[in-house]
């Protein structure tokens, strides 16, 4: 049964998505599992980075997953500056509304003029709230989408820090921010980073060790964010217990230091 489903998933990915004739079975299963993690509410969003496929090709692929009976909820495809996000609108709206009413956004300033990362000052919060409100205004109308359906939208040239907005969309517990008016480089080079990897087995399609989240927190601000990280982990475990697509949740941490970090 699993073998037959695996072949269907590989065939669907190769047929619908651009430049994927050589896509391996492992990649096809990872892709399907990441989308299922959004559908079942483990995370609000998935940033599509598997191929150079366009919105319509991804939409066609999602509809194929629905035809296979794998996707049961409404998913929204959002194109922001040629970056494609696959969104669980209900979960995303709920999370972004929570952020909009919070004065502590757990943002980490990694602007290149800093000697090391630090927490963002409160005077940046109103500007970021304004961007969150604009983002909410775009996706909220799609909340009424029918189950097992796909909608499509786009935002052109937003004057946002996209690194920060994507971090919010992906529901990272701490999100990076930098002053875009002073450049797009960061101060994370050779900075000790605590790497968090969340993985689980996707029993829905019989696939092991699916990465659900991967993010870093600089060691120099870890203590200041530790309580929030623990709360985030508890919330994730609660969401995990409320679904039946995935089993055997693991949260793995280690420390890395890299010569350069792309955001």
Curated annotation (Swiss-Prot):
InterPro entries linked: DUF4504
Domain of life: Eukaryota
Family of this protein: Belongs to the UPF0739 family.
Listed name of the protein: UPF0739 protein C1orf74 homolog
Organism: Xenopus tropicalis (Western clawed frog)
